Amino acid sequence: MRKILLFFICMSCIKPNKTENNIHTDTKELEKYINLPVAIQKAEYEISKTKLGELSQDCSQIIEIHAVIKFSNQDYKAIFKSANKKYNFPLIVKKEDCRDWYPPYVKKYFVKESNELFKINSVVYEENNFLKENTKGNLIFFPVENNTICCIASICEK
């Protein structure tokens, strides 16, 4: 009886990693929010929705997207040609400084120096080729290795 009780106590102490269970690979859901000029070949992403209080005037909920998106070499280049604003500056993120809320599959790309950070302006300020039409939000693309882009988006939904 003690062994069974000890087993259940131990099992209740182990927390499942929710991040790993929520990773999607079907690009159709991702394409509901992000409008890229080229086809996505492969993607791993999470979409989380946070309801806001009744006093919120602009949004009823915030949609957070963390995605790692793979493209062909030609499509990868086309994305950056079509970006309306590019901000290039050194970006150094060490493992110990990495934001805790980034999922592991995104976090692994932020362990070395990167020379480029591409931030795409949101629709609120000027036209944005990468969010769906009439969408308020902010989108950041980090180019990483092998024609892959990390995308972090916050979208306001009414």
Which stretches of residues belong to each language-model region?
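Sec-dependent N-terminal signal peptides
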Residues: 3-11
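N-terminal export/targeting and maturation segments
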Residues: 13-75
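Long, charged/polar, surface-exposed segments that mediate recognition or autoinhibition
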Residues: 66-122
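Secondary-structure transition/turn motif
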Residues: 73, 153-158
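Low-complexity, intrinsically disordered Gly/Pro/Thr-rich segments
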Residues: 124-141
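Short, exposed beta-strand-loop hairpins at the edges of beta-sheets
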Residues: 137-146, 151-153
